[in-house]
């Protein structure tokens, strides 16, 4: 039961409350709070402060609100227009993205623009322009938090701008002021965009005077490296031996993989891996275990085998199930073969002896080895025995006071056996000369200790990667090789220590490395404020990290970026991905997922590309694209010697003529290219024989292949793909490919040709393809000084002067303060001199900021917010929204008008309403219709008439 009648009355349920509230714009935003239904009742209409005048008309202190209270703010007149008594229009479902503007948790609260605040700002700023006669702009909330697309604020159209001007202004003056308004509006948007993004790394890499130079030099270094690799393959005939046809997919993939191996620093020995059958890589790492905190305990290890005894038994004891070290793709049935690899070696050799009859000498060596082991065990000194006993005592104490003491007795017995076997294995590598071994052992374990300590710092994250050299050696699967390496000390005494620890890197060096295969992780969300160094700092904690690639931001994704992290092939990429998903950067979830390998690396294009006429056109386009890209990155710019020839070459390239291909560039791929650009036709023969092209146009002609032209085209296509990352047959560029997981991943090749093709199809294809490649054929020319001046370019000296004036403050007469240093001076000229002498770095920052902003303006393809839909596309009839003079249309269901009480019912949105100025002209005089009247001759003299 309620506490009082008022409380009971307040909580009474109104069935249609939500339906009525949705019609009123001032209640729509706060109709339903986020905090659930408990707090929502306090926000109902009875507590609305704007309803005071309507609810205080009678009754007690609290009365049940009448239905008349829901019809709008203000007191209703007794006798109103019948139009106001009409039932409200049907409530339409709001568009997607409308409604409450809240921060999107997907983007971590990042919204540098606060577009709703900007819309409110511009609405208040233009309040003089948009009075009651003008409806709000269409979809003003398109830039709000509920939408993924940010836009500029809506700009006033000419009709709205006229309302802000004087009545007696001339038409030419109106157009001049409106042009100035549009220019200022554009300047303001560019400046706001620059201020919002100038501190972000991707923006600095594009336009900052220092960072952009470093980035361009880095990219040029990548291109130079790719050019060297291509020229090496071009000279040894690898490029000329392959055709860019989908039927030769294997040969194309081999060429691309060869380039990748060369780019990774591989040798000719590593190229042999391409001849081997691809197989799953062996990963030297632990299997997935429950996450546990490992306490780093520093111990002195006498030999590398100690790492097995002191690091491995603890996980075996603590874990609820035995999970020894082994490769990921190893069989689960052989889980116990790797722990005692040294002790089981005799068994393996005996098994091999039963299979191979040639293994008898190995048995003899094995017997010798056993006798040596017995002698070593008997000749150990007291220090080694005491050390082993102390270590076993410590392990017993740890086992006794272990936190997880609920292990089964069988597991404890097995763990005890493992420790006993490990202590025996610890003594095996020692040679009879103990002094020499001990002297060498004191130097080696230090490196191992450092490795163990660094690994155990982040054991929860790097658990799949923790693996030491001895463990990797036992996992190698080829036990005979291991034993052969261990038997070498008997031949040479000087190499005793080197053979005790088998270096896995040396073993790998003997085999070709598959440098073209990697593992990678895809990051779906990267806030613009996250830098590359922060991502690298996180990834460096995992073994096998190679590089990271970050894409350019997109306005459709609120300037969020995507990223790719590349690791070596033999890592457990799923464990690393799990570790990355448990971390956040700048309160942003990166959304890490495992990036799959490429499914189809060679993809077919239209088969008409093999036709002779199309091939000749493609050669021309490829040569022009190669020239533009080479000139853009200055790949072959240092070789030309004759200034006159280079000048003529530049003029011809600017004019777009292809007559100088091969002359204005020292690129060997473009040499003598003009010989293949001249078309040939047997016109005389066709004329004499009376052959016409009508049959060809109707029936078509078979595909004509010219192998010589195709070989020239393939050379150009591979040059663009390998050097400039341009996939010609896909008419696109693969950006930042040198940082991606697959450096030369995908290529499009000519597909199966059709049987016949018409001349019309060929011409349409050539024209269409040239249109698609227009982005590569046209040069990007920066804007001139005059053009950027119109966009609001800044002057360095002017900005420095403003900086000096801003840091010159007058405290009293002959007393001035410099805020930068806090010192006081007698005059402003002394502060100016002080700033240029003591704060020169601040002045340089101002000059760099000016150059930074001007570089942004010079880019014709600069990133910026798209225009508001209301600015770019105006509705056909603005009077439908109450925007113009005249009468409103009938109130059909999709009607959306201004709130009641703003003017006469059927007039144009308050033209003769109370507290509003009288109606004014809204169009220039030449667009207005002059009212023509007539004079009745029979009417009296004082009658009304029009001029």
Curated annotation (Swiss-Prot):
UniProt keywords, alphabetically: Nucleus, Phosphoprotein, RNA-mediated gene silencing
Compositionally biased tracts (Low complexity): 646-657
Protein name listed in UniProt: Serrate RNA effector molecule homolog
Biased composition (Polar residues): 465-479
UniProt modified residues of type Phosphothreonine: 300
Sequence positions bearing Phosphotyrosine: 79
Region (Disordered), start-end ranges: 1-100, 300-492, 643-666, 855-892
Subcellular location: Nucleus
Basic and acidic residues compositional bias, start-end: 8-33, 40-49, 345-366, 393-427
Compositional bias per record (Basic residues), positions renumbered to this chain: 367-376
Compositionally biased intervals (Acidic residues): 330-341
One Pfam family named in its UniProt record: SERRATE_Ars2_N
């Amino acid at each position: 039961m309620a506490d009082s009648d008022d409380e009971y009355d307040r909580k009474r349920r109104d069935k249609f409350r939500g339906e009525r509230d949705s019609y009123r714009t001032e209640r729509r935003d706060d109709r339903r709070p986020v905090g659930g239904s408990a707090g929502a009742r306090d926000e109902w209409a009875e507590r609305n402060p704007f309803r005071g005048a309507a609810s205080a008309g009678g009754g007690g202190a609290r009365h049940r609100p009448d239905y008349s209270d829901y019809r709008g703010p203000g007191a209703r007149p007794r006798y109103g227009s019948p139009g106001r008594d009409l039932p409200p229009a049907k409530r339409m479902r709001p568009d997607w993205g409308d409604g409450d503007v809240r921060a999107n948790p997907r983007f971590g609260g990042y919204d540098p623009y606060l577009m709703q605040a900007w819309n409110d700002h511009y609405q208040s700023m233009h309040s003089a322009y948009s009075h009651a006669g003008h409806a709000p702009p269409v979809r003003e909330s398109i830039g709000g938090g509920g939408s993924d697309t940010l836009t500029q604020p809506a700009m006033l159209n000419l009709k709205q701008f006229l309302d802000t001007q004087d009545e007696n202004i001339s038409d030419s003056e109106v157009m001049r002021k409106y042009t100035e308004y549009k220019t200022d509006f554009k300047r303001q948007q560019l400046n706001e965009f620059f201020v919002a993004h100038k501190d972000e790394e991707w923006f600095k890499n594009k336009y900052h005077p220092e960072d952009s130079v470093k980035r361009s030099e880095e990219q040029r270094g990548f291109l130079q490296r790719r050019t060297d690799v291509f020229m090496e393959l071009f000279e040894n005939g690898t490029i000329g031996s392959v055709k860019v046809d989908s039927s030769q997919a294997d040969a194309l993939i081999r060429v691309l993989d060869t380039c990748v191996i060369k780019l990774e620093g591989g040798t000719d020995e590593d190229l042999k891996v391409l001849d081997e059958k691809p197989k799953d890589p062996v990963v030297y790492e632990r299997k997935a275990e429950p996450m546990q905190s490992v306490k780093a305990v520093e111990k002195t290890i006498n030999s590398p085998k100690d790492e097995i005894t002191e690091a491995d038994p603890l996980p075996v004891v603590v874990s609820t199930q035995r999970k020894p070290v082994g490769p990921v793709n190893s069989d689960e049935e052989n889980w116990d073969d790797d722990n005692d690899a040294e002790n089981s070696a005799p068994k393996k050799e005996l098994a091999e002896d039963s299979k191979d009859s040639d293994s008898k000498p190995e048995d003899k060596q094995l017997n010798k080895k056993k006798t040596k082991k017995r002698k070593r065990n008997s000749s150990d000194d007291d220090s080694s025995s005491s050390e082993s006993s102390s270590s076993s005592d410590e392990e017993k104490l740890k086992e006794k006071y272990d936190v997880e003491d609920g292990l089964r007795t069988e597991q404890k017995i097995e763990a005890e056996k493992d420790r006993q076997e490990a202590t025996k294995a610890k003594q095996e590598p020692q040679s009879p000369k103990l002094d020499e071994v001990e002297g060498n052992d004191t130097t080696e374990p230090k490196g191992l200790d450092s490795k163990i300590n660094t690994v155990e710092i982040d054991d929860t994250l790097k658990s799949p990667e923790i693996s030491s050299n001895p463990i990797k050696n036992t996992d190698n699967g080829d036990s005979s090789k291991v034993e052969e390496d261990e038997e070498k000390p008997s031949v040479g005494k000087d190499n005793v220590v080197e053979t005790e620890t088998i270096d896995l890197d040396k073993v790998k060096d003997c085999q070709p490395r598959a440098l073209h295969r990697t593992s990678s992780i895809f990051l779906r969300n990267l806030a613009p404020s996250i830098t590359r160094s922060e991502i690298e700092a996180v990834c460096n904690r995992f073994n096998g990290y190679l590089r990271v690639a970050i894409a350019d931001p997109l306005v459709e994704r609120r300037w969020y970026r995507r990223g790719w992290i590349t690791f070596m092939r033999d890592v457990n990429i799923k464990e690393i991905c799990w570790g990355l998903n448990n971390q956040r950067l700048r309160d942003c979830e990166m959304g890490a997922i495992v990036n799959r390998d490429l499914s189809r690396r060679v993809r077919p294009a239209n088969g008409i590309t093999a036709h002779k006429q199309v091939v000749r056109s493609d050669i021309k386009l490829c040569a022009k694209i190669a020239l533009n890209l080479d000139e853009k990155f200055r790949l072959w710019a240092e070789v030309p010697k004759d200034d006159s020839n280079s000048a003529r070459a530049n003029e011809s390239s600017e004019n777009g003529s292809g007559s100088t291909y091969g002359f204005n560039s020292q690129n060997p791929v473009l040499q003598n290219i003009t010989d293949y650009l001249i078309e040939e036709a047997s016109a005389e023969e066709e004329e004499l024989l009376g052959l016409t092209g009508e049959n060809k146009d109707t029936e078509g002609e078979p595909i004509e292949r010219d192998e010589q032209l195709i070989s020239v085209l393939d050379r150009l296509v591979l040059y663009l793909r390998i050097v400039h990352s341009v996939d010609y047959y896909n008419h696109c560029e693969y950006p930042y490919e040198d940082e991606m997981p697959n450096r030369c991943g995908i290529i499009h090749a000519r597909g199966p040709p059709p049987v016949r093709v018409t001349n019309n199809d060929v011409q349409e294809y050539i024209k269409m393809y040239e249109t698609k490649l227009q982005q590569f054929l046209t040069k990007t020319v920066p804007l001139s000084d005059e053009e950027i001046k119109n966009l609001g370019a800044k002057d360095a000296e002017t900005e420095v002067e403003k900086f000096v004036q801003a840091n010159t403050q007058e405290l009293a007469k002959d007393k001035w303060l410099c805020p930068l240093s806090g010192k006081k001076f007698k005059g402003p000229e002394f502060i100016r001199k002080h700033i240029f002498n003591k704060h020169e770095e601040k002045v340089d920052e101002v000059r760099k900021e000016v150059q930074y902003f001007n570089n942004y303006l010079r880019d014709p393809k600069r990133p910026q917010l798209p225009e508001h839909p209301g600015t770019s596309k105006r509705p056909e009839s603005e009077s439908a929204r109450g925007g113009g003079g005249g009468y409103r249309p009938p109130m059909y269901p999709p009607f959306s008008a201004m709130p009641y009480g703003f003017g006469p019912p059927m007039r144009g949105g308050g033209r003769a309403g109370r507290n509003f100025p009288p109606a004014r002209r809204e169009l220039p005089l030449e667009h207005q219709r002059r009212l023509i009247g007539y004079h009745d001759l029979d009417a009296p003299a004082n009658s009304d008439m029009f001029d």
